[in-house]
Regions:
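Helix-coil boundary/capping segments in enzymes
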Residues: 1-239
Length: 239
């Protein structure tokens, strides 16, 4: 989260006559350790964990160990303090609602659509699907600190149309007003062999890109029932 520029002032200052200022694309990254609390109990043992190394902190997940990256926490730092990796405690947490709202006030932003986070890029099908529910619960709890100002975007998988419809209905009941779908429908076969899983994981961005060469594509009439549910629920979609 960037340091706010206080020169912009407040959108609610006297004399402002153009209505609320709405930021249509802010980003929120959940804390790395939130999965242990928000995944279904049956999946929590598989959640990512933070390991404190001598040089930096590491995120350990499914046999991989990667450093905590600081690249999105450089705004406002002096050049001499620039660093690519570091510790969780050094990050300016985008998930702190008080800091988020204070920055919005300084920038004159009244309300915001909040993208980011989403499911785990997992090799495990059950964990992958469960992470959609876990993220939805976390981000809605986070937004509940200012529900009139923070509007989180939900996530839904797109491997099977009926499966997606069930996720959309669940998100609507939770209060989401916008849902992000993968850019292309996903290949449901990708979870069945180790080679396909490897291709799926390396080719997806946050498990949300999909398969542009797949047999199922959004323009096909099979998707009409999904579009109808989205309209009936008053849900806006984004890709």
């Amino acid at each position: 989260m960037s340091e706010a520029d206080p020169l912009f002032g407040s959108a609610t200052k006297p004399g402002w006559t153009h209505g609320p200022i709405f930021d249509a694309d802010v980003h929120i990254d959940p804390p790395h350790d939130m999965w242990k609390e928000y995944l279904p109990e049956s999946q929590r043992a598989k959640a990512p964990v933070i390991e404190h190394g001598e040089d930096c902190d590491y995120i350990c997940f499914e046999g991989n160990r990667r450093p905590v990256m600081m690249i999105n926490n450089q705004a406002g730092r002096a050049g001499k303090d620039f660093k690519m990796k570091g510790r969780v405690s050094e990050q300016r947490n985008t998930y702190d609602p008080a800091k988020r709202l204070a920055d919005m006030d300084l920038d004159g932003i009244d309300q915001a659509i909040c993208f980011g986070g989403g499911p785990l890029g997992s090799f495990d099908n059950d964990l992958y699907i469960a992470s959609f529910e876990g993220y939805s619960r976390w981000v809605m709890d986070w937004a509940s600190n200012a529900p009139h100002r923070l509007f989180p975007v939900g996530h839904a998988p797109m491997r099977d149309i009926d499966e997606t419809i069930s996720h959309v209905k669940r998100l609507a009941k939770m209060g989401f007003r916008m849902v992000q779908l993968p850019a292309f429908p996903q290949n449901p076969e990708a979870w069945k062999t180790s080679s396909e899983i490897k291709n799926m994981k390396s080719g997806q961005v946050a498990a949300q890109t999909g398969d542009p060469q797949g047999a199922l594509q959004y323009y096909q009439p099979e998707f009409d029932k999904l579009w109808k549910v989205l309209c009936d629920e008053g849900i806006v979609i984004t890709f």
